[in-house]
Amino acid sequence: MHSHFLYIFVVFSYFIHYNKRKRTGKTNLKRIRPGVREALPGVKVKERKSMEVLYKSTRGNGETVTASQAILKGLSDDGGLFVPTSIPALDVPMEKLAAMSYQEVAYEVMSRFLTDFTEDELKNCIANAYDAKFDTEEIAPLTKADGVYYLELFHGATIAFKDMALSILPHLMTTAAKKNGVKNEIVILTATSGDTGKAAMAGFADVPGTKIIVFYPKHGVSPIQEKQMVTQKGANTYVVGITGNFDDAQTAVKKMFNDHELAAELDQAGFQFSSANSINIGRLVPQIVYYVYAYASLVRDGRIKDGQEINV
């Protein structure tokens, strides 16, 4: 799990340093700790927006797929995670980013990674995700207390930060299915230690063409989290309590993904697996957005200068 957040922080850091380089004519990628090159070996850093960003497995499989294909598959056939073959640049002046709404920043960030989505497709996904389901128009406001700024990520439907990505993943996935001519019903398998399960079910509830099955450790979540999951409405939502811990649930889900015989049987029955866990690039890319938005908000409010480093 830590590697997923490391990836997000590295990409966010590169975005900020790229904007600094545009303004000053220089940047220092070595200051990104632990560093793009060290954290993502074999991944190139692009200094201009690429025409297309493809994805490959972290296990070295040479095959590449488009963003929409990576979102649909969730996990590579060799069991690795999908990562971009190059990191795109957020080549938008900070003064413009600072004046944008959350939805507009989301488009600028996500369009760099999800390059096979059209502008209309991506903007439609964003509009349907970040709407009245959030109890504030800012979506992710910044507040200050005792000299520390707090990025509020609890304004979504389930009051968990997972809502930030899981509100848009169903829309990305159904759009990806249409783009790739997928006729099968998509079965989302998700392991959770609490928050992800409820947020994922809330996001996918009654979404046409999908079903979602959440596995959680029977004695590893709080009573409130369990009640949230087992009372979730939706004709396509299912939840299963297992004997074991979260790692057991996650391992079982990955084994099902890697069972090619099971995949073939499902295909014959008109189904295919995908994931709503953070192994899916459709979860990771939306999570980059709120870091960029937070930084731009600090610049907008005059709290920091463009290019100034911050602790996150």
Where are these regions (language model features)?
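PLP-dependent amino-acid enzyme catalytic core
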Residues: 46-312
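Hydrophobic alpha-helical signal peptides and transmembrane signal-/tail-anchor segments
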Residues: 1-17
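Short, Lys/Arg-enriched N-terminal segments with co-localized hydrophobic residues
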Residues: 14-23, 30, 39-50
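Short, basic/polar N-terminal leader/transit segment immediately after the initiator methionine
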Residues: 3-4, 22, 31, 53-56
